[in-house]
Amino acid sequence: MTQFTIVPLSGSTDFRGILVTPTALGSAETIHTAQGSASLPDLVSIEAYNSDTVARPLKLAWGGTTDPDDVLAFVLLPGETRMIVHQRPIRNSLIIKAASVTMTWVDGQSYTGAADKIVITGGSYVQRQTS
């Protein structure tokens, strides 16, 4: 029978928030490192909060930094808290990183990245498969 345990993101202490300071993927903040198993996944759920008064971009590098293959992009509205990833699998010690990177959205609108405005909240967690 498959078993899971709920644990905090490895970049968090006791389910506390992680402030996203970097504004470039090359120096992105480590949010989580998956367990080292090649067969047992971590199912990651990430909630993000924009503390600013303007919309801000957020990019997650999911196990790599090749854009668009490994990069997930989001725009968070002013004051918005949103579950941006729900139970997405990752394994084999791959790393999830976050940065508020300036980008142009599909509608042509440009969003400026900013340090210390987005928080990966304590509502984020990992369902770690243990067997």
Predicted regions and their residues:
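Buried hydrophobic-core signal for structured, non-transmembrane domains
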Residues: 44-49, 94-96, 101
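Asparagine-centered strand-capping/turn motif at beta-strand->loop junctions
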Residues: 33-35, 47-54
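C-terminal interaction-tip segments
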Residues: 1-38, 98-131
